[in-house]
Amino acid sequence: MNIQEIISDKVTQALVAAGAPAGSEALVRPSAKVQFGDYQANGIMSAAKKMGLPPRQLAEQVVANLALDGIASKVEIAGPGFINIFLDAAWLAAQADAALADPRLGVARVEPQTIVVDYSAPNVAKEMHVGHLRSTIIGDAAVRTLEFLGHNVIRANHVGDWGTQFGMLIAYLEKVQGSSETGDMALADLEAFYREAKKHYDEDAAFAERARGYVVKLQGGDEYCREMWRKLVDITMRQNQRNYDRLNVTLTDDDVMGESLYNPMLPGIVADLKAKGLATESEGATVVFLNEFRNKEGEPMGVIVQKKDGGYLYTTTDIACAKYRYETLGANRILYYIDSRQHQHLMQAWTIVRKAGYVPDSVSLEHHMFGMMLGKDGKPFKTRAGGTIKLADLLDEAIERAAKLIAAKNPELSGDELKALVEVVGIGAVKYADLSKNRTTDYIFDWDNMLAFEGNTAPYMQYAYTRVASIFKRAGIDENTLQGAITLTEEREKALATRLMQFEETILSVAREGTPHVMCAYLYEVAGLFSSFYEACPILNAEEESVRASRLKLAALTARTLKTGLDTLGIKTVERM
């Protein structure tokens, strides 16, 4: 049920009937204040200007043609030409009843698209660190949202599994192959392994020569080198999967589409760019000059697609990547959850992709960029010693802090119940603190704020859900067997129902813009409206049975909306806190 869309269609029809030009937009939005109704149509001024009419005159004509009988109880013209629409309480109650009866809460399935979502993208032979957190959890929230709406989503974990460093790693793996630990080494050891390999490469000329030879062999498909390379990849991805599982992220090994996947395509792409006259030789390298981007001298910027020594760059891989996602995966839309510092690089690659005809304009290429995670000092979040914080260590600390918090609040909890609750709250706090911020901005990582039981935090939202669910437990009522109809006679009943019925509008916005903070803000508002309703409107102690039944249904719809919304974010809920 998309009330905004229903009203928008009605206002658009009324605009046409009033003689507005084709394409005039209704611009229907939820009203910011209750005195302006539940929805407001803001498109009158623009249409009136095109028609040469006073806005209020056009607004009067639109209202005269507005077919909202049964949907709106009142329609008013305000200010220079805004149309305020007040929803009919009986109609709204019927929609809320229908939403509660629907496992999807009234959210319609969309016409499915094939959408590729590129996110997480850790590097092989290195442990995941806090810098991977935002891409991983924001991307996964987008995936969950798109799948809920019915899209065919292809997860693409663009793992850094290729490059000259693998010659060095293979050479060192060969050197220590006799060690019984090597085959199953933990990734923490593999980080030390990487440092030792680099040290040998820098200090031992013979080792460096052998490493360079292995790069050539690996790129040539040498079976021995491929086997050693695969071992390094497998060790890394096993550890990464543990992080994904702890984070309640839906990525698996089946979603890995590493850089190595695109290597066979690179020579053909460079040759094709040359044949199309897009790439030229410049100082021994193959370069695409783009008029859309200018260097400091104001000249077209040169983007290297093949180095003088024959090697390829990330841009070449990203060109192949976009081409593959359209031609092989059949993408209608491709979303990249990569930090904002990569924006120009991606724009250059996509400009080449479009010019070469690899991806048509009908396919959307979208950089859903995000800012940095900062410490309280406003600098990139690091250890006290200035080092990179490992993601696993961050999650361990989140659980430790949540354990202390919950032990202080609920000392009677113990055993498996306590362990499960601590993990849900600790991991949820880290994720929600990130997801609740506008992804385009930097944000301050603050343990005290994210674990607080007040404000727009995971603990508050998880508690809000359990608070609603506890109503049914206390009364011994199964929320799936509720009888009667929803009626909305109190102001706070209607305010809660109106916001609950905007769930579809919210989830469509998140899917369109890739902005999970919009869902967080919505759920936080729903929780607040429920608190106001709960305080003002007795539920179990309502004087009339019909009112009690109605309010129980509103509570059930609230609980299901909170749970479903949090699930689209990848945040778990519990029945008791």
From Swiss-Prot:
GO cellular component: cytoplasm
Gene3D superfamilies registered for this protein in UniProt: Arginyl tRNA synthetase N-terminal domain, HUPs, Isoleucyl-tRNA Synthetase, Domain 1
Enzyme Commission number(s) from the entry: 6.1.1.19
Main location: cytoplasm
Keywords for this protein: Aminoacyl-tRNA synthetase, ATP-binding, Cytoplasm, Ligase, Nucleotide-binding, Protein biosynthesis
One matching Pfam family: DALR_1
The organism's place on the tree of life at top rank: Bacteria
Gene Ontology terms describing biological process: arginyl-tRNA aminoacylation
Homology family: Belongs to the class-I aminoacyl-tRNA synthetase family.
Self-association and partners: Monomer.
Name of the featured protein: Arginine--tRNA ligase
